UniProtKB/Swiss-Prot annotation:
The lineage of its organism: Bacteria, Pseudomonadati, Pseudomonadota, Gammaproteobacteria, Enterobacterales. One of its GO terms (molecular function) is structural constituent of ribosome. One of its GO terms (cellular component) is ribonucleoprotein complex. This is Large ribosomal subunit protein bL20. It comes from Serratia proteamaculans (strain 568). Coiled coil: none annotated. InterPro entries: Ribosomal_bL20, RIBOSOMAL_L20_CS, Ribosomal_protein_bL20_C. PANTHER family: 39S RIBOSOMAL PROTEIN L20. Keywords: Ribonucleoprotein, Ribosomal protein, RNA-binding, rRNA-binding. Binds directly to 23S ribosomal RNA and is necessary for the in vitro assembly process of the 50S ribosomal subunit. It is not involved in the protein synthesizing functions of that subunit. Belongs to the bacterial ribosomal protein bL20 family. Disulfide bonds: none annotated.
Amino acid sequence: MARVKRGVIARARHKKILKQAKGYYGARSRVYRVAFQAVIKAGQYAYRDRRQRKRQFRQLWIARINAAARVNGLSYSKFINGLKKASIEIDRKILADIAVFDKVAFGALVEKAKAALA
């Protein structure tokens, strides 16, 4: 039986990892063993942060809506409650966009929410 030499496969595997680690600082981009750990850790961070990104954006939208609603004399929770009672179904992403870029339209939404609460 012929002897199996793994040089080609090992080289390819190492090249693949070192290519992924390109741009990392110091040994993390040059030494296979260190680069492998760095790439694994980067993958874990990426996986975790793809989920956190969704939470962080929602927090940002809520903070923006809250600030704009308070300028118009209503808290965030009362504003959202008023919109629900007025059966206005606009998601937080769009509300935050309106709050930042179209203050007049947001003011109108606040007035409708106030009317529904009264």
